């Protein structure tokens, strides 16, 4: 009898080794190597492979291939359609990740209910809840649709058989880390199980043209659990994020083969489920305390939509040898960089000051155009001088203190004017080449010192 062979696979990065190691050479993680048995391919599989090689299609010139634009299937959640690129594409495999309890299952259950109807049937497969638990959650959301079918199963073979037998219009698998194939020795959620189960679901989606949504767990760092292999295999990767203590939830696309990865959908968690936020700028600014030192407003582009958000800063003398720099919703390295610019180019003595910054509403911002608002908030708190509450700030700040040009300035200014702001501080390079809306004064500044004089009077 032949000896059974095994290999050790890192559960963080997928690195393979013939022997166990405490530290993975690939990613440096400790105690992540798990033993998995090497299974030989059966003779019938090799025969089938050789047969498929003989019958493979011949290469065709790209100009001779006929295509047809199939309409996307839209849900009743416009924000969900926006992030997907306009709706659900037939035959697509969509991965949704997020922290535990953030609302992934709630979102997909609502989407399933909206997609199901007289002509569409949806199969919701839960590996974490029984059918009764899923029904209780559906009752809380007011979902009672006979075209929505629920299955509690984790065996990939039974799941595949159920899809083949029912032939639904849409499928949801919650979650991929609970699904397993019985002929693989490793535990559910391991690299081999996730790879093989995802490959099987992808095969079903592509051959039958069924859109499949799969839920993925995230690690404590916030990324999809396991190696990047799962994200490479699927067509679309969505992250559902938000603060536990806030009602707002944000859906972002980090990979999308059928649309933009810059779009963002905003939802609010209520007792009846998730509802879309149609005017996020107004929601984020409704609790703003106008006239407070350390507060400024900026217009950030999230995909094709400008969103006005409040950036708050608190600067206070440090009680320790090294001052603290903390930021929520903004990269703390950017905060340190901009504080260094204020010290060197403007002369603010911030080396002995603690700095605490946050974006109100739990939004995460990463575009350079918010730099000027961060600088204004820091200087305003340090001088204890509030900026004009009717001012809005846009601009990227360079290391020499210059305020650099940003994109889509006209859309940003129009959004600020729509919400009642009277003055817009923008880069001087952005003043020409577009139509300025009525009712708002647009002022161009060339550097940080000029921006501070304009907004804080000194």
From Swiss-Prot:
A zinc finger (C4-type) spans 10-27. Its EC number is 3.6.4.-. SMART domains: AAA. Disruption phenotype: General sensitivity to DNA damaging agents. Increased sensitivity to methyl methanesulfonate (MMS), decreased survival after UV irradiation in transition and stationary phase, decrease in transformation with chromosomal DNA requiring homologous recombination. Increased sensitivity to mitomycin C, H(2)O(2), and nalidixic acid; a further disA deletion suppresses H(2)O(2) sensitivity but has no effect on MMS sensitivity, suggesting radA and disA might work in the same DNA repair pathway. Partially suppresses DNA damaging agent sensitivity of recU deletions. GO terms for biological process: recombinational repair. Residues 354-458 are annotated as: Lon-protease-like. Keywords: ATP-binding, DNA damage, DNA repair, DNA-binding, Hydrolase, Metal-binding, Nucleotide-binding, Stress response, Zinc, Zinc-finger. A motif (RadA KNRFG motif) lies at residues 255-259. Belongs to the RecA family. RadA subfamily. HAMAP family: RadA_bact. This is DNA repair protein RadA.
């Amino acid at each position: 009898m032949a000896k059974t062979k095994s290999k050790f696979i890192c559960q963080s990065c997928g690195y393979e080794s013939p022997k166990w190691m405490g530290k993975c050479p690939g990613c440096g993680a400790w105690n992540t190597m798990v033993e998995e048995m090497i299974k030989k391919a059966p003779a019938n599989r090799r025969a089938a492979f050789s047969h498929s090689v003989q019958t493979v299609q011949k290469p065709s010139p790209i100009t001779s291939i006929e295509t047809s634009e199939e309409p996307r299937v839209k849900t009743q959640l416009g924000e969900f359609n926006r992030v997907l690129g306009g709706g659900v594409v037939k035959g697509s495999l969509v991965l949704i990740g997020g922290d535990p309890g953030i609302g992934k299952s709630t979102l997909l259950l609502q989407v399933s209910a909206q997609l199901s109807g007289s002509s569409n049937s949806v199969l919701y497969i839960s590996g974490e809840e029984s059918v009764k638990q899923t029904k209780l959650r559906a009752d809380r959301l007011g979902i009672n649709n006979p075209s929505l079918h629920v299955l509690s199963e984790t065996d990939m073979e039974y799941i595949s058989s159920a899809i083949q037998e029912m032939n639904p219009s849409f499928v949801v698998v919650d979650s991929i880390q609970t699904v397993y194939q019985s002929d693989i020795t490793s535990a559910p959620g391991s690299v081999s199980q996730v790879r093989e189960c995802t490959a099987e679901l992808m095969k079903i989606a592509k051959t039958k043209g069924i859109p499949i949504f799969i839920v993925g767990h995230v690690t404590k760092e916030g990324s999809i659990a396991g190696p990047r292999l799962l994200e490479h295999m699927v067509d679309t990767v969505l992250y559902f994020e938000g603060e536990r203590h806030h009602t707002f939830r944000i859906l972002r696309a980090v990979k999308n083969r059928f649309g933009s990865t810059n779009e963002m959908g905003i939802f609010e968690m209520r007792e009846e489920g998730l509802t879309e936020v149609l005017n996020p700028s107004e929601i984020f600014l409704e609790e703003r305390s106008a006239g407070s030192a350390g507060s400024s407003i900026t217009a950030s582009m999230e995909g094709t939509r400008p969103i006005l958000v409040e950036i708050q800063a608190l600067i206070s003398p440090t009680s320790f040898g090294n001052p603290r720099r903390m930021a929520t919703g903004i990269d703390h390295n950017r905060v340190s960089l901009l504080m260094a610019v204020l010290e060197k180019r403007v002369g603010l003595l911030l080396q002995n000051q603690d700095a605490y910054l946050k974006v109100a509403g739990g939004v995460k911002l990463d575009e350079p155009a918010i730099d000027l608002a961060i600088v204004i908030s820091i200087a305003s708190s340090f001088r204890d001088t509030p900026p004009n509450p009717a001012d809005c700030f846009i601009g990227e700040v360079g290391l020499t203190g210059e305020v650099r040009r940003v994109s889509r300035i006209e859309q940003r200014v129009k959004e600020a004017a729509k919400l009642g702001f009277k003055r817009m501080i923008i880069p001087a390079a952005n003043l020409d080449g577009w139509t300025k809306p009525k009712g708002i004064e647009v002022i161009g500044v060339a550097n940080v010192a000029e921006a501070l004089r304009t907004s804080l009077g000194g």
